[in-house]
């Protein structure tokens, strides 16, 4: 552990990463099947970008829920219920919170009420639905919870993924420290892809202040 690199050193790290990405030999490389069943997914993956600028218009509640469901949703199979992302041992340690930074309205009659600004706990419901459990309508702590609060400017909201490691640790011991964050990454990517499919900008951020974020979420 040590001091963070300065701006010039950070840029050098980014440049080195780009060089690694472009260092693969072109000869004998196998092309992706452009007409295969995964073509639409490949196109979506190519579209996904980390975008830190957001428009002035609010996202309607059904569109927002579709993006959040990609991470926090459940799917009922014939023999069991599972989440939208893989979970080691089917223990499902992840918990989801959503900070709605501005009101979003109802798009149609299927969404009977707008979603007010505030902090919510997300709980998956059957048939592709999410329940927003209100925690707090006061968003005054939101800026203090993130190390780069300017990213919140014009953003519709923030999905926060937390986890209870206890069940995973009981089964897997220290490996839970790898398995649970891996699962969180799966869930986050699901929402980022859903945002890309919806034509919305989104970015994953890790710069948060644990204590302040915990207070914001009521943890």
Segments predicted by a language model, with ranges:
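A glycine-rich helix N-cap at a beta->alpha junction
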Residues: 217-219
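Small-aliphatic-rich amphipathic alpha-helix that forms the alpha element of a beta-alpha
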Residues: 48, 67, 96, 157-168, ...
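N-terminal amphipathic, basic helical "cap/leader" segment at the start of enzyme domains
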Residues: 1-154
């Amino acid at each position: 552990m040590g001091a963070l690199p300065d701006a010039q050193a950070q840029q050098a790290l980014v440049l080195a990463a780009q060089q690694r990405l472009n260092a693969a030999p072109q000869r004998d490389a196998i092309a992706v099947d452009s007409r295969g069943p995964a073509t639409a997914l490949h196109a979506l993956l190519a579209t996904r970008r980390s975008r830190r600028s957001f428009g002035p218009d609010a996202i309607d509640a059904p569109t927002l829920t579709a993006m959040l469901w990609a991470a926090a949703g459940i799917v009922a199979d014939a023999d069991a219920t599972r989440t939208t992302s893989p979970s080691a041992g089917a223990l499902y340690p992840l918990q989801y919170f959503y900070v709605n930074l501005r009101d979003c309205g109802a798009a149609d009659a299927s969404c009977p009420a707008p979603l007010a600004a505030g902090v919510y706990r997300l709980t998956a419901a059957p048939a592709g639905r999410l329940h927003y459990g209100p925690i707090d309508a006061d968003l005054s702590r939101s800026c203090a919870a993130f190390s780069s609060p300017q990213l919140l400017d014009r953003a519709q909201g923030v999905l926060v993924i937390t986890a209870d490691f206890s069940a995973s640790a009981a089964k897997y011991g220290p490996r839970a420290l790898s398995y649970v964050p891996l699962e969180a990454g799966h869930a986050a990517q699901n929402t980022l892809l859903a945002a890309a499919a919806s034509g919305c900008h989104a970015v994953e951020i890790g710069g948060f202040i644990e204590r302040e974020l915990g207070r914001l979420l009521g943890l």
